From Swiss-Prot:
Keyword Isomerase attached: no
Annotated UMP binding sites: 52, 72, 133-140
Enzyme class: transferase
GO CC list: cytosol
Protein name stated in the entry: Uridylate kinase
Amino acid sequence: MPAYKRILLKLSGEALMGDDAFGINHATIVRMVEEIAEVTRMGVQVAVVIGGGNIFRGVAGGSVGMDRATADYMGMLATVMNALALGDTMDKAGLIARVMSAIGIERVVEPYVRPKALQYLEEGKVVIFAAGTGNPFFTTDTAAALRGAEIGAEIVLKATKVDGVYTADPKKDPRATRYTNITFDEAMGKNLEVMDATAFALCRDQKLPIKVFSIFKHGALKRVVQGEDEGTLVHV
């Protein structure tokens, strides 16, 4: 039995790269879609917010000397490319996906309209939110928090390369231990990087829990949705 009826899954663009240096790794995106399909078959309504860091990062090297707002818009367009790839892979896997963009590109994807997104979710379709919040200076983590709150998701699942939040960087400190669960205030007090400050504050204010887990662990998404001890739960 799933522990949640409606979830917001935040995927980083980097997660789509697999072992590649950039871009979209076909085997990786197919495997991710299989994991999502398994959850939808349990009757869970799934919405996805996807990043664009595998193609372009507004805050990174490719944008040196560039106007920040322009760089952020380029990053948003990168998320649209990822969303289209994810949606196409879902369609081929037998899922019905709908890509909705926060910036208008009507010939490519439909615009984000909240009632329409809710309708799609109720119909069992997977909704993929592209282009972040549609505004520069906001991360896709913030978009995940915002869309999660808007659609009434019960939890934001942040899929990362690490299987939870640790007391220290597990790559640098072998004594680092994983938190099973932690409150928002504790995470802030310990300066633990769960999400950026804006996204984190929005989730905290809306009492929207965050689960940090590794998308690279086979079956992890299903275990999270079933309420098992996987990753780290950040709660009020």
